[in-house]
């Protein structure tokens, strides 16, 4: 039951460093505890800083009163363009200087691009709905607005993969759903609820779950390389975003934008693209130095810190029930991670328990 997470972790490790999982484990075992603890602390801190900074920067680009830029598709397109160029640049550098950079060779193959296209459509939905959610809701409510990813993971795993879920895991999903609805109720009571942003958040959560499922199916087409998949996804996204920008009139809005020639604007846009590229790298690093399970726990703790920082930064006052909704979402997500980890460990230690699970209450 724990084979899939280990496999994804190994893929990420090999994609990032080119070193096998066995050699990495032996190397980490030889390192002093203090050094390993310091490495983990630095990597987790890097993940937190990158992820939180990206959210606040995207909020500035998408909904800043000083910018007044109403082109969310263009912002997303530009971030995909920066990521594509960075991937190609690192690939070229790795080819020219093999000892300096370890990065797979990237050559655009139209046949591979077509194979990745279905996943790219889901990827486009994921990043577009994510940015649209952030545009219409405040950063403090952002995590609650996108909190249904775990619930969709359970639902789609059953509908598409025919994988059942234990009763205790379903209970944690119930807590998440309860926190989500309480958060909507409290945002409405405070007069800050954006129904449009909430719908985009739900759609973003759905696309995140679909992206995780279909990534497994598409990885063989790119030789199980996370970086190749990132490159093709972003190239396909750039191509598909162009007609969307034309149809939605964003090109006209961009030409009329007063800060179009501002160096500060393009610096912020490019920085957003760099953060978009970096988040994939630091996510892989965090899984490499910890585990997929620890990565999920770290992500939940990061979301909690991000919410507190957002409330302080925007100087908002929230009710007790509003904070309760956040705690329910974060607590339910943490509990789900713990339950799934416990179930995987139990199955690994006692394979016969898998048969006993069938008698438990299922989805």
Curated annotation (Swiss-Prot):
Which molecular-function annotations from GO does this UniProt entry contain? GDP-fucose transmembrane transporter activity
| Signal peptide start and end residues | none
Predominantly, its location class is Golgi
Query: This protein's superkingdom?
Result: Eukaryota
- Report keywords, A-Z: Golgi apparatus, Membrane, Sugar transport, Transmembrane, Transmembrane helix, Transport
What is catalysed by this protein?
GMP(out) + GDP-beta-L-fucose(in) = GMP(in) + GDP-beta-L-fucose(out)
InterPro entries found in the cross-reference section: Sugar_P_trans_dom (IPR004853), TPT_transporter (IPR050186)
Query: Where is it localised?
Result: Golgi apparatus membrane
Task: List the Pfam families.
Answer: TPT (PF03151)
One Gene Ontology cellular component annotation held by this UniProt entry: Golgi membrane
Membrane topology (UniProt): Multi-pass membrane protein
**Can you tell me which family this protein belongs to?**
Belongs to the TPT transporter family. SLC35C subfamily.
Q: What does the record give as the function of this protein? A: Antiporter specific for GDP-l-fucose and depending on the concomitant reverse transport of GMP. Involved in GDP-fucose import from the cytoplasm into the Golgi lumen.
Which PANTHER family does the entry mention? SOLUTE CARRIER FAMILY 35 (PTHR11132)
Q: What is this protein called?
A: GDP-fucose transporter 1
